[in-house]
Regions:
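Active-site environment of divalent metal-dependent phosphoester hydrolases
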Residues: 44-47, 78-81, 135-139, 164-167, ...
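Extended substrate/RNA-proximal surfaces in nucleic-acid metabolism proteins
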Residues: 49-158, 236-244
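Active-site neighborhood of phospho(di)ester-bond hydrolases with catalytic His/Asp-centered motifs
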Residues: 2-4, 37-40, 72-76, 129-131, ...
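Short acidic/histidine-rich active-site segments
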Residues: 184-200
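Mid-to-C-terminal alpha-helical segments outside catalytic/metal-binding sites
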Residues: 202, 206-244
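A structural motif
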Residues: 34, 154, 184-185
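An N-terminally biased module of ancient metal coordination in phosphate/nucleic-acid-related enzymes
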Residues: 1-68
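Non-catalytic positions within long, well-ordered alpha-helices that form the structural scaffold/packing
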Residues: 30, 122, 180-181
Length: 244
């Protein structure tokens, strides 16, 4: 399996607090058959930036050589009006050198403003992956409009493991499952902030995915869609949610 959203890098955001915790996260991820983790520290201008991230990422990779888990670098970028300037400045916020960008939607903005932001980002030739939209009540209260938005702007959707098993409450769980039911989600990721998340939340969510989804779709959510992103083999081109 591949995990495209994890706060694995220590001491840069609200994720792993130290190198030992990061190594423990990798160890447990390997136990649960995760072969690749994309480390996605928060990038939120004025709150979290990527200063020092590369150095800690390289240290972590060097310390984790005994584990059979590939570690790649990305970011979880907060989508506000400043994001367009960040993209224009060509700061290293994407998944490696790809055009894919994992974005977190603002929780207090109107759906109309969020949709406008997404269209502007897409117009900058960015392939958008929306992180855990099921947790954003303002967005999910405009559920049908959101589905039209991801179709029109050609966005991909990443669900959190915790959402699927009810960590964030009944509304979020049911919304996540509705997205799964209509196959509007493209990835399920850990959004792990500590070793415990890999030990408990992620395996429980994987089990639930296989209960809720047919095997082909489950594999896409957990592995094959993510693999096509990191190998730049394809992208979602239509609402059918197929990659390639």
């Amino acid at each position: 399996m591949l995990d495209i959203h994890s706060h694995l890098i220590f001491g840069v955001d609200d994720g792993s607090s130290c190198l030992d915790e990061s190594i423990r996260m990798i160890e447990i991820a390997e136990m649960h058959n995760i072969s690749t983790i994309i480390a996605t520290p928060h990038f939120h201008n004025g709150i979290f930036n990527n200063n020092g991230v590369l150095e800690k990422f390289e240290l972590l990779v060097n310390k984790a050589v005994d584990y059979h888990v590939e570690i790649r670098l990305g970011n979880e970028v907060f989508a506000d009006d400043e994001i367009l300037n960040i993209i224009k400045a060509k700061k290293n916020i994407n998944f490696g050198n790809s055009q894919y960008l994992l974005i977190e939607l603002p929780y207090s903005d109107s759906f109309e403003h969020i949709a406008n932001l997404i269209y502007k980002i897409a117009a900058a030739n960015i392939k958008i992956i929306i992180a855990h939209p099921e947790r954003n009540r303002k967005v999910m209260k405009s559920f049908h409009e959101f589905i039209k938005l991801i179709h029109t702007a050609n966005c991909q959707v990443q669900l959190d493991a915790g959402s699927i098993i009810g960590v964030y409450g009944a509304f979020v769980k049911e919304t996540a499952r509705q997205l799964l039911k209509i196959k509007a989600a493209d990835f399920m990721a850990s959004n792990a902030h500590c070793a415990r998340d890999y030990m408990t939340l992620y395996p429980a969510a994987v089990q639930k995915i296989y209960q809720l989804c047919d095997e082909e779709y489950a594999i896409k959510l957990l592995e094959s869609n993510a693999r096509k992103i990191i190998t730049v083999e394809g992208s979602i081109s239509e609402y059918g949610r197929e990659i390639g």
